[in-house]
Amino acid sequence: MRNNIRIAIDGPAAAGKSTVAKIIAKRLSYLYIDTGAMYRALTYVALQQKVALDDEQALISLLKNTYIELKSSEQGQLVFVNGEDVTNIIRSEEVTNAVSLVAKHPSVREEMVARQRALAKNGGVVMDGRDIGTYVLPNAEVKIFLKASVEERAKRRHAENIARGFPSDLETLKKEIARRDQIDSEREVAPLKKAEDAIEIDTTSLSIEEVVDRIMEIVNERIG
């Protein structure tokens, strides 16, 4: 199998992007790049250092002094910030509720996108996020856009939170996910939207395995 194609998986919060992308990357022996984790890592540092999330200059200054590293392991992808393992803490409710506010700043996205493109320059990657197919990797050989209802996405996030031991309330999650959709869709730079050449998959009533199998069919068609 050719090892140099780039697979972009986009979609709104809790549509199943990361879960599916990890499995696809493992099957293809590709590098998995969780762009959302990079924004979460910066958000975590900003919250820790009490940087105002609406202060774009302060955030870009913080980012330029923050080393974010994604590492593969037996347990999956690990996220490090300046040498500290933040894999689990960046999934906290506090970070989750704040990450869209950080990601909407144009200069923050510009710096992150430069880092993401550098990681993907040699191909052999599966990258997920909100704007991979439209902005980060517009020439990706395979582009997928996952979607699901707000209710279904809230249920999934609720189950994830419970599994991680985080406090969780389903009705609150529905509101938060709808709010994040609005912020992500209306932001000035690279808003959440389906690339014209992306294949859309509604995951509301599909299992993870069914979504993975559908994407693998598409990948095999493109590289066959």
UniProtKB/Swiss-Prot annotation:
It is an enzyme of class 2 (transferase). GO terms for molecular function: ATP binding; CMP kinase activity; dCMP kinase activity. The keyword Cytoplasm applies. One of its GO terms (cellular component) is cytosol. It is found in: Cytoplasm. Keywords: ATP-binding, Cytoplasm, Kinase, Nucleotide-binding, Transferase. Belongs to the cytidylate kinase family. Type 1 subfamily. This is Cytidylate kinase.
